[in-house]
Each structure stands twice: as structure tokens, then as C-alpha cells.
Swiss-Prot record:
Main localization, broad class: cytoplasm
Ranges of biased composition (kind: Low complexity): 324-340, 730-740
Record-annotated DUF1170 domain positions: 332-515
Source species taxonomy: Eukaryota, Metazoa, Chordata, Craniata, Vertebrata
Protein name according to UniProt: Connector enhancer of kinase suppressor of ras 2
Domain PH: 570-669
Biased composition (Pro residues): 701-714
PROSITE patterns xref list: CRIC, PDZ, PH_DOMAIN, SAM_DOMAIN
Organism expressing this protein natively: Rattus norvegicus (Rat)
Amino acid sequence: MALIMEPVSKWSPSQVVDWMKGLDDCLQQYIKNFEREKISGDQLLRITHQELEDLGVSRIGHQELILEAVDLLCALNYGLETENLKTLSHKLNASAKNLQNFITGRRRSGHYDGRTSRKLPNDFLTSVVDLIGAAKSLLAWLDRSPFAAVTDYSVTRNNVIQLCLELTTIVQQDCTVYETENKILHVCKTLSGVCDHIISLSSDPLVSQSAHLEVIQLANIKPSEGLGMYIKSTYDGLHVITGTTENSPADRCKKIHAGDEVIQVNHQTVVGWQLKNLVNALREDPSGVILTLKKRPQSMLTSAPALLKNMRWKPLALQPLIPRSPTSSVATPSSTISTPTKRDSSALQDLYIPPPPAEPYIPRDEKGNLPCEDLRGHMVGKPVHKGSESPNSFLDQEYRKRFNIVEEDTVLYCYEYEKGRSSSQGRRESTPTYGKLRPISMPVEYNWVGDYEDPNKMKRDSRRENSLLRYMSNEKIAQEEYMFQRNSKKDTGKKSKKKGDKSTSPTHYSLLPSLQMDALRQDIMGTPVPETTLYHTFQQSSLQHKSKKKNKGAIAGKSKRRISCKDLGRGDCEGWLWKKKDAKSYFSQKWKKYWFVLKDASLYWYINEEDEKAEGFISLPEFKIDRASECRKKYAFKACHPKIKSFYFAAEHLDDMNRWLNRINMLTAGYAERERIKQEQDYWSESDKEEADTPSTPKQDSPPPPYDTYPRPPSMSCASPYVEAKHSRLSSTETSQSQSSHEEFRQEVTGSSAVSPIRKTASQRRSWQDLIETPLTSSGLHYLQTLPLEDSVFSDSAAISPEHRRQSTLPTQKCHLQDHYGPYPLAESERMQVLNGNGGKPRSFTLPRDSGFNHCCLNAPVSACDPQDDIQPPEVEEEEEEEEEEAAGENIGEKNENREEKLGDSLQDLYRALEEASLSPLGEHRISTKIEYKLSFIKRCNDPVMNEKLHRLRILKSTLKAREGEVAIIDKVLDNPDLTSKEFQQWKQMYLDLFLDICQNTTSNDPLSISSEVDVITSSLTHTHSYIETHV
């Protein structure tokens, strides 16, 4: 720093005075006192409240303003070379642990009384303030580029902000000291975990690099051009550049980038200055200006420009919102903009510095919106008059969201202006800490390059995207498509994490340097990428998806689990191990035994040694293997990854555990960093099927399965507006299993009749509860078994009557009706045959899909259904084609390899199926549980009119049931011939609400009023239940 600027500690008294001239206007009255006392730079850095009072600064607010600016100078003087993201994380972690230790020490003292509700002591609040100050310093780094553009750091920033807000709320709550301390301890532990996560990312060069200073000179500035910089000021006086305008002097020098802090202007330190004083300093010399900028870490490669160094854009006021040519990479301004002469202090947070104005800007309204005329001028691309608002006003929001404006076949990239911002907000707060930043403005056009993804995978996933944004080079390379989505989850065929898979929201971009990205494209695509591809232009794209045909060859090669234990061969280490499952309920098994095979630094596990497909695998070089001392199970070890998840295993004996640990460490140690998993391979993959298994010992009190546990195809997950958002918790593995089961079912229905129906897989059996919630399959029908076992297994499907066929293949809407109104009526003679066939009522053997009860579903052909049921929308037919092609690709080499399932304990499986179906061993329905009551309100029908009627029916049924209970209580009293006054008084006190309700209802016996009251209650209940359905 000594070569670029003189340290603040060596300032002379005249330099201190020059620096104070740029502070707030209210502080100018004290400059003479500083000049008279000859305060040097070293004295300035160590100044205190008492010394300020001796200098005549008697007001506390003025003292705080000076000390805030001095704090910024201290950070610049002492922390420039040592401050980085890791050190700031260490400081925050230390502050959190200090606060924890302080609370623990207070509780150990003999005078501690946690039951009091008095205010916390001052030393306690001081520790809280120190913790928040350390968090602010960390947020000052996370809140701007390059960290603000990385998803992981953006999520971390949001977590830290949320925890700090929670901490400030806790200390102001009126509760006991013990409760307050418990809440603060929880926040401190969470903050420590966040800091440990940042510290663990030591391999990321951005975490360990510190900031540096750089001197930039802008010369030959034209009077009509201006500097072309966007500057945003924090409340305490940091000045951050948020971008440059296209072809401006700041853009042409190629050294000014978003996130840079302005430290000096013409060798005068401007840290802590007002923004208007900074602007005056920039305009002081019309021929040029010398800037000293503080730059955040960008990239490890200093020879190649980082992607963030290409940030430039036109002011939004100069950008017409009309479709642009796909080949135009550089656009020219269509009009000029003037500069404000004077604005209030609250509006000086953001400033664009173009040529001098012809007249003042038009003020905003109280919400900060532009006048309608100006906005209409922007929308149609007309030139803006000279009195228009600064273009940077569009970039001056605290929280900005991007959204798509679709006009015919054009997708535009725009900003949404925040309307809730107050214009009277002060520029500074009273805390002396520094670095409290607002999020920086982001550009309209920028060379963001997303993570590379397999083009075949992107084509397969394209039908699940809601919107597409394409950035294409001048050569129009088809593989360079980067899709952006905001609020959607990708439904993939496996529950696998990929090395390059991150959120594809607009806030996440790759930080690979340009040369590395070029090398990556040339290596994968095999096509040369010239330098012109570094600058991507916006491409209009139609919202119509591309071809929905899936790549058959790519599907078969993606999964590493689709390999049998025999084909895998003898591994480096084999044996039985216990694996801990993610328990979904209290009664579910925590551990399950698998056959494990260690092969080529990958760990596979199978159900048995003859299994045709691995239940899961992990790539060990990406995981850390160690003893799992936190597990209660003996001889446990774990494979953990800070960004993915942890797997826990356990051996039977200590020798087995040591053997596995030694063998795994030997294999993984030989893999160098460059030989680890490639980007298109998986970190890990695991099936969720074992997690849905019920315990081996059935429990009578275990709750039944929820209605929405049957997975849905991806096409139905977000397409229908009537699907609950709660169902998004289903894993992608379950979705894949559901698709494959439907495809196998359809193939067996339309295939040869030589396949025995007893060999149906258990995944095809479904209960009534599953059927209620399950949407249409690819064939548009539900497969439902309603016949007795003897008819379903040992009879030919052609001998079934059309009524039975129609009843066994019901669409979703009819299943809803059948659930509420009873089964569809059969012919009287047929019903008697069914009842008399086994001497009882017909039984349904549609067991839950995860049970081991080996019965089959009826192969009802689609042609036997109701003609109305055969009508499918085009989307369903297209999905059926895609799934058939996918099934054909997946089943290459496996079509004739069906193996016999092992028959389990039929009685045990039957009991388990009855338990999950909420039936007693005698076939009677059990008392509903809380889960059933809760999920009974989220049953949905695809027809909104029918859905509303079903809601009304449920409400009336529940109301009728409640009234019947009240009548039974009343009858109990009225039917008692020996009723005494004392007993009646006790009954009255016990059912006081019911008694008052009776008294009120007896006063109004008018039938019209009663019916209107019922309608009002019903309508209100309908509204309430609709709200619950939307938001639960």
C-alpha cells in the first residue's frame, strides 16, 4: 500500500483537515478546532469520545459520524493486506463463541437468577453488538461481486443476515433472562456452523485472497461524454462502483469493474465522504482524473481477464425495450441523458456521472416511481427528454428481482423496481461499525457464463423448464445454451449430485476465467472458440420447447447403479455392512444391512450378492472417510462431504471396520486431484426405495401412509395449478421409480401374453389411498384392482365384463368421486355373483406399492375402458412417446432377464398392508390419525368446479358428523329418567358451549334464517379450506 498511497497513520495535520472537508456538512464547523490542535493521522486513528468532546464536538450524533468515518480509515490502514473472507469468518466465529462463553460463565456464577425478566446487563449487550459488527464486516464482502453472484455465498449471506436480525429481535423481547440466553445460544451455534462452512472451503481461492489497491488514470474526457461510472454509497461512507456505461472512458480503460471501492480521487482520500463531495472531486479536473480503487479478489489467473471484468452496459433509460437482432453484439445509445444539479441527501445513494445537465431531473413520486409519460417513453423506445430521471435510479434497489417479459417470440431481460423503499431514510446509522452495504446494482448485459452441462441432459430437461434465456456467441454454437429458472426444482431420473450442478437462477454464475472456459469448451465440444465468444449477446428465443425426443444412448450410460453385482466383478473389498438410512418416522428402521463392494474408488451396495442393480454408490475420492464417533452403533464409520451429505456405515466387528477403512484410504490416496471425478459423472447416487420400507415388526400404533406419498411424473409436478406445493418434497428417485413402473406395466399390457401375472413387480401394486392422490399416468388411466384374488390371478382378462373393466381403470376425477360417493354400481346379478363367490363382500387386493405381498394387478387393456377415458390430451400422448423411448433405451439387454421374486411371509405382508391402509385385521376402518385428518383437506380434483363441490361436500359431512355428536350428548341427558338437578348442573358446566348454543338457537326458529346461517357458515368454511389448500 505504501507504493500506491500514503498510510493514514502518517498523515500530516493538513491532510487530516483536507479529509474532514469531505465529511457531512454538520461537521465542517469543527475543522478549525482540528486545525488548531494539529491532529495528525495517527492521533485521528486513535481518537475517542472524550478527545472529541475536548475538541468541541459535544453532540453525540456528531461524534458518532466522525467515529464512523474513522472506523473506515482504520479498516483501510490496518486490514487491507490481511482481511479476506476466511479471516472475517474466523472473527465472526470467535465473536459467536465469546458470547457463548460469556453466557456460560454468567450461569456458573453464584448470583445468577435466570427467572427474572429485567433487562440484560450492558456487558452482555456489548458482546451482542460486537458479534453483529463482525457479521457486518463479513457481509461487506459477501454482498458484492464476485461473491454476490455465487449461489453458495449468496445463501450464506442471507443466512447471516437472518441470524443477525433474529439476534437483534431476541435482545429486545420481554421474557426471562434464561429464555433469552437460550435463544441467543442457538443463534450463536448456528452462526458458528455457517463460519465453519466458509472456512472449510479453503480450496476456493476467493476465500483466501485479500483485497488490493490499484491506481487508474482516466484522460481525454470529452465534455459531452462524462466518466460513465455508476457509484453507490453505503450509509457510513463507502463508495462502490456498480458498473460502467458502454464505450465510456471508464469502460474503455478496461480496469474499472463492478464491486470496486473508490478510495482516492486525485490522491485525495475520499473514504467516509458524502457522495456529492465525491462527485465534485471527480468533476474538479475536466481533462482527466486519477482514481485509487480497492479491488476484491477476482481470479487466481492474473494474466487472463476474469469474467467479471467485462461488466458494462448502457443506462436503462437509453435502452429501448424492443426486440434486438440476434447478431447484434454491441448497441449504441439512442439518446443522451442529463445529470442532476442538486438532489436531496436520501437520493444521493446512487449516481451516474454523464455530462452536465441542461435542466434538473424530474422528481419521483413518494414511492420512487417514474412518471407514466417517461416510463411509456422507455417502453416504446422513444428518446427521453432532457429532464428525465437518472438511468441509475433503476439500479438503486436494495433487493432486485429479474423477470421475463414475453412479447410474441421475444424474451427480454429486465429489472423489477422495488416500490416499498422509503425516500426519507437516513444515510447513516448510529453504530460506529463500518461496511454495511446495500446489494450492488447488476448489469443488463454482461458476459456471465453458466456452468457447462451436458447438451443431451439439457435437451431431456428442456420440457420441464418454464422459460429459456439463451446467450449465444457470434458463431451461434448450439451447445452454448444456458437455462435460467427462478422457483423450480429439477426432476431428474436419479437422486444424484453432480459436480457442476448448482442452482441455475440468475444469481448464480460460474467464476471460471475466460481462458479456462475456452479450454473447457474446446475439450468437450471439439470446436474452436474464438475470443469473440467471450462477449455474449442476448438472443430472442421462442417459448416453444425444442424437440422432446430423448437421447436413448445417453440415458443408458448415465447411471452407475445400473450394473449387477455379477457384472461388477470381484471388488477390492467386499462384505456385509450396515448402512444408516434417513429416518422418515420414529418407527422406521435406522439401519439396514447391504452387500458392499469396493471397486475402483467407488463404493457400491446391493440388497444381496445376486442383485441386478445397485441400491446406491458413492465416489470415495470426493468424500472424507473417518470414524463416526457421534453414532451410537458400534464400529461405525462415515463418508462425509461439506456440500452434499454424509453417509454412515457400520461393521459387525472391529477388525472388519479397520479393514474397510484401510482399504478405502489406500484406494482414495492414490487418486490425484486431476484424476478425480469428471464433471459429467456423479458424486453419489442412491435409491429411496429402502426408506419407504416399513419396520420388520409391524406396530399397531404406527400411522398410515400419507395420501401424497405416491410419486408423480415430472410433467405433472408443476404443470397443473391444482397440485399442492407440498408434494415437491418427493425425491427425484421416487419419480423415476414411478415412471419406470408405469412403463413396465404398459409394456406388459401390450406385450406378449406369455408373461405370468404372478411375476408382476411389487411397485405396480397400489392402494386406494395412493390412487386418490395419484395423477394420470402416461396412458391417462389408473390401474385399480377391485376383484377377488381368485378372479384376478387365475382368470383371463378377456373374460372380465366391460363394467368390471371400466371400474378397474378409473381416471383421476372418477376416483375422487368414487372415494366420496361410493363405488360405481354394477349390474345386480354381477354384484350378487361377486358377493356369493367367496361368501362375503368383495375384497380389494391392491396392496401398497412398497409392501412385499406378492400379488398382481389386473392387466386391464386400455381398449376395454370407457371411450371417454381413452381420450388423452396431446401432452399426455407426447409424454407417453417419450417414456416409451426412454424405457426402450433403459431396457436394452434387460428385456428378457426377469427373475423370480422371493416369496415372503404372506400373512405378515397382508397385516402390514392392512395397517398402511388404516384397516383393522377384520377389515374395518381404523380411527383416523392426525396425518389423515390433515391430508384429507388437500385431496384435489383436476376439475376446479368438481373440486369446489367436493369441498362443500366434505364441509357438510364434517358439520353433520359434529352435529350428530352433539345430538348424542344431548340424548344422553334426555334419556336419563333418574336425572337430578346436580347431575344436570355438572353436565351443563361440562358442555357449557353446547348449552349456550342450544339457548341461542331456540330463540330463532325461522327456517329461512337457519338456512341462511348454514350457507354463511359453509361459505366461510369453504374459504378457509381453500386457503389451507393453497398454502399448506
